[in-house]
Amino acid sequence: MSDSPVLPRAHGAAVLTAAMRSVAEDFQVDELPAFDASGEGEHLLLSVRKRGQNTAYVAKRLAQWAGIAEMGIGYAGLKDRHAVTTQRFSVHLPKRIAPDLSALDDDDMQVVEHTWHNRKLQRGALHGNRFVLTLREVVGDQTAIDARLHAIAARGIPNWFGEQRFGRDGGNVAAALAMFGYTRQLDGTLAPAPKRRLRNDQRSLLLSAARSALFNQVLTARVEQGDWDAPLDGEAWMLDGSRSVFGPEPWSEVLAERLARFDIHPSGPLWGAGELRCSADAAAIEQAALSDPQSLALRTGLEAAGLKQERRALRLRPQALAHAWLDAQTLQLTFALPPGCYATAVLWELGDVVDAARVAPQSRSEG
């Protein structure tokens, strides 16, 4: 198991090379809220459009503006600074007296909407994200690219965790191993080492990276076998747009119809303590895919950390996927994804896209 493995493509070989995020406007993300504001309460709900600023920076800025601790700021998800993004923040103001909103507006940040709500905005409280991505310096046959996009819209894609989850050069996986009490030798084998003690936020980041690496390992096996979007004996099914899981149960025409209309998806493990939800062939593939020494070390560490077995859909279908050629070498994509899903997974099925923000000296990984 590699810290930054090359993932297989489900739709065949790459059909393009391109660059993304040459400028921040080439990567636009708008949150799709999960609820309407109540219009009352002591949390000021702000919709903020920002350029070149990540979520943590804006949260700190809002806390300073309101004169409150940062724990009084809520947001549903993290957004990268190398982008133009719109997202909600809640600001706890018990007296319902807000400072001058215009003081927040500048060239790189604007409050586009504000209202009151009766509770703090919680992580994950969003319906999804809408993306508008502009790829530049595109090299590839337009007919083949158009066909690949139509195939993605019709069949979906593997629901990979994006490379952002793993840090630069996959370093978060190595850091997770160190946290669990392992060090990698020069020959690639693992040896016991003193466990690293970390802050809670760092620990959470590394636990997520370890889980994500194991999930991607299972998904790799399913893609290589060609059954990432097809039923196996013993499959555990995940409802679309939900964390609900059911099965295993005998294959039937009802399940076939639900799978065909993307109401359910095959699932893979988010590792933790407890029994695998799947069985038979599906469980055999998962155990085989995670039987190497590094995977076993990550599994043991996650179980010891108190995480429980959960599931994640193996398949993802971008919603409202559309594209337009702005010129012969510039392709614009628009689509929406559920929370926790990665736009880079869509781009990977197209080809090799260089992230200009990552190769620039000032770049940092997405948040």
UniProtKB/Swiss-Prot annotation:
InterPro entries xref list: PsdUridine_synth_cat_dom_sf (IPR020103), PsdUridine_synth_TruD (IPR001656), PsdUridine_synth_TruD_CS (IPR020119), PsdUridine_synth_TruD_insert (IPR011760), TruD_catalytic (IPR042214), TruD_insert_sf (IPR043165), TruD_pseudoU_synthase (IPR050170)
Lineage: superkingdom: Bacteria
Cited PROSITE patterns: TRUD (PS50984), UPF0024 (PS01268)
GO BP annotations listed: tRNA pseudouridine synthesis
GO annotation, cellular component aspect: cytosol
Classification via SUPFAM superfamilies: Pseudouridine synthase
UniProt keyword annotations, A-Z: Isomerase, tRNA processing
Location of the active site: 80 (nucleophile)
Keyword Isomerase part of the UniProt annotation: yes
Annotated TRUD domain residues: 156-316
Reactions catalysed according to its record: uridine(13) in tRNA = pseudouridine(13) in tRNA
Molecular function GO terms recorded: RNA binding; tRNA pseudouridine(13) synthase activity
Top enzyme class: isomerase
Enzyme Commission number(s) from the entry: 5.4.99.27
Gene3D superfamilies the UniProt entry points to: TruD, catalytic domain, TruD, insertion domain
CDD domains: PseudoU_synth_EcTruD
Pfam families: TruD
Entry keyword Cytoplasm: no
Family to which this protein belongs: Belongs to the pseudouridine synthase TruD family.
NCBIfam families for the chain: PRK00984.1-2
Function: Responsible for synthesis of pseudouridine from uracil-13 in transfer RNAs.
Protein known as: tRNA pseudouridine synthase D
Record organism: Xanthomonas campestris pv. campestris (strain B100)
